[in-house]
Amino acid sequence: MPVITLPDGSQRHYDHPVSPMDVALDIGPGLAKATIAGRVNGELVDASDLIENDATLAIITAKDEEGLEIIRHSCAHLLGHAIKQLWPHTKMAIGPVVDNGFYYDVDLDRTLTQEDVEALEKRMHELAEKNYDVIKKKVSWHDARETFVKRGETYKVAILDENIAHDDKPGLYHHEEYVDMCRGPHVPNMRFCHHFKLMKTAGAYWRGDSNNKMLQRIYGTAWADKKALNAYLQRLEEAAKRDHRKIGKQLDLYHMQEEAPGMVFWHNDGWTIFRELEVFVRSKLKEYQYQEVKGPFMMDRVLWEKTGHWDNYKDAMFTTSSENREYCIKPMNCPGHVQIFNQGLKSYRDLPLRMAEFGSCHRNEPSGALHGLMRVRGFTQDDAHIFCTEEQIRDEVNACIRMVYDMYSTFGFEKIVVKLSTRPDKRIGSDEMWDRAEADLAVALEENNIPFEYQLGEGAFYGPKIEFTLYDCLDRAWQCGTVQLDFSLPSRLSASYVGEDNERKVPVMIHRAILGSMERFIGILTEEFAGFFPTWLAPVQVVVMNITDSQSEYVNELTQKLQNAGIRVKADLRNEKIGFKIREHTLRRVPYMLVCGDKEVEAGKVAVRTRRGKDLGSLDVNDVIEKLQQEIRSRSLQQLEE
């Protein structure tokens, strides 16, 4: 009979099989009431599942990350329960958990309207408030199939036929009269599923195949309590205000159009931000001793066959033909950098060789996945590749890590999650090589006092990698930086150097990206700053305004002086009220507005106002210029007097 070992090391002895709920009740009624599921020997199980042998057990509650995921999964079943009551002929497909919520794909003979979604959410609340028990039954494959055939659930039958072994015992979850199929676990009672909201609908092909029927996907969010739900909805509201697509239009940064899907038309102000970002990256390339190169954006298909990209990536590559040759528009820069490395004989004395490029890349992303600047088809990578010896890996990775944190801190990103992906089952190279490579990455992180977590088996077949995910002011995750070791591509493309022993050797290649896609990073910055770019990045840094025509000459002189000082400035001499001008430029998020009236002209000064509405008073012109230059030069995130 089972001996149950709890997380604190204490043990409970039973003379009969017990469930996690039984053990929780044995510990106390409060814990039993909070129990959602159990983790038995490291595996999540339903609260009602029996434990027959000695085992470790952790009780899962809504406070646990797994508990919240289970709540969300059960809310998907609740959605199914409600939709079958409102529209009984609906056929249910799949209803998984996603970030912050869940969705269900349904086959319905009507297009759901906003009113339908509101009615569906209302019915879900009515059902959840009944606090009914969710009953799990393990049945044979044949019984499960018969159940869904009788109910007309053709998609569930297809899942059984195509994805579940005949000797398996699927779990059927009974929500009163509604039955769904799932591996589970699920909540034991619907009292855990009170805090949710349906968010939107979208189209989705069955099994993601455009040859199949288009279903309707209903998205929802679910949380453990009302406070967490409201906080999430507030974050979404704030995110909508910060949407880079909306701000990009307001500030006239860029546009996109149907004739060039996923391609950016940069307007003057947006391109100014892009170029300033390039200047910043170039300053770091110089500091960390990179050479900058530029490769062709199109190369013969034969080269991509050698690299392995054609076999593994061709669906995402654009191609074109000329003079009976097929060319691929590059989706990445690395093969081109190896071609540059291969020009001329290289010695071990030439290594490490650090090669960077603002590479114009194109990938044939599905049209439905395109999203403003965040997901595009044409983009610019701040890409670099380091050619080095195995002995140099640790030092080079160390420098890459310092560069990543150096650059992210400039933008105020402080929360960065780091993951180290290790060897997959299918890989090249010896175990000794992988041991050393993984150790080099881990030690480099440790030497920089950077906490990280392992992603076991998630590395590429050609080498382990470090991923850097930064979190913005809304606590959204953006995976931007990578440091990837590559033991394959240099060999495939015949890269070599002459070692100290006069023998030819293959260099190790380190792929390094920090911002990732320049376009995407500008989208991230637009939302992070809500369009209030720090002065050094702002397209227009200063606007000089007159109050009446009598100050026009002074405004022009001051504007010229600011331009000569390297400041991006505009003069606004329109015959409008000064309050109107200030409001307009405040909405344009111009960092500084300099107002010139008769008093300022007479004193040789200027009234300084920030876009946040702070009046800095009447200041000496040369002092203002000096302070602005210092703020811009230091790439400060703070404005004057902040």
Curated annotation (Swiss-Prot):
Binding site for Zn(2+): 334, 385, 511
Cofactor: Zn(2+)
Any one GO BP annotation for this protein: threonyl-tRNA aminoacylation
Listed Pfam families: HGTP_anticodon (PF03129), TGS (PF02824), tRNA-synt_2b (PF00587), tRNA_SAD (PF07973)
GO cellular component: cytosol
Single GO term (MF): metal ion binding
Known catalytic reactions: tRNA(Thr) + L-threonine + ATP = L-threonyl-tRNA(Thr) + AMP + diphosphate + H(+)
Domain TGS: 1-61
Xref: SMART domains: tRNA_SAD (SM00863)
E.C. numbers: 6.1.1.3
Keyword DNA damage: no
Catalytic: region residues: 243-534
Cofactor detail note: Binds 1 zinc ion per subunit.
Family matches, as InterPro entries: aa-tRNA-synt_IIb, aa-tRNA-synth_II, aa-tRNA-synth_II/BPL/LPL, Anticodon-bd, Anticodon-bd_dom_sf, Beta-grasp_dom_sf, TGS, TGS-like
Keywords, comma-separated and alphabetical: Aminoacyl-tRNA synthetase, ATP-binding, Cytoplasm, Ligase, Metal-binding, Nucleotide-binding, Protein biosynthesis, RNA-binding, tRNA-binding, Zinc
Function: Catalyzes the attachment of threonine to tRNA(Thr) in a two-step reaction: L-threonine is first activated by ATP to form Thr-AMP and then transferred to the acceptor end of tRNA(Thr). Also edits incorrectly charged L-seryl-tRNA(Thr).
PANTHER family: THREONINE--TRNA LIGASE, CHLOROPLASTIC_MITOCHONDRIAL 2, THREONINE-TRNA LIGASE
UniProt-recorded name of the protein: Threonine--tRNA ligase
Gene name in the database record: thrS
